[in-house]
Amino acid sequence: VKLIVAVIQPTKLDSVRTALAEMAVERLTVYDAEGYGRQRGQTATFRGIEYQTNLLRKVIVEIAVNDDFLEKTLSIIENVSRTGQEGNIGDGKILVLPIEQVVQIGGKEKGPSAV
């Protein structure tokens, strides 16, 4: 069992959720985040004054998947989250972490079947 942590553009969230649902990946956690990578923020203008924003808005999507779904899920997130044909700086990152144990709180399932 693996935990996929995808940091993506907020505008891509609905497309990612729809594409994952079509593949029967429907259990996920989403939360808002702010951060920066190589681009180190961006310049914005407010009421005629230019200022530097250090943190950019992102969305983090967490999905626990069984090993059989890992590559398919990664491929969908990567392809749907990309802006432009080749992608751009700021499109996000996908991290894959091992999960040692899964316990379903509302039931009695443990391990891969609890995912």
PLM feature spans:
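Positively charged, small/polar-rich N-terminal and surface patches that mediate targeting and assembly
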Residues: 1-115
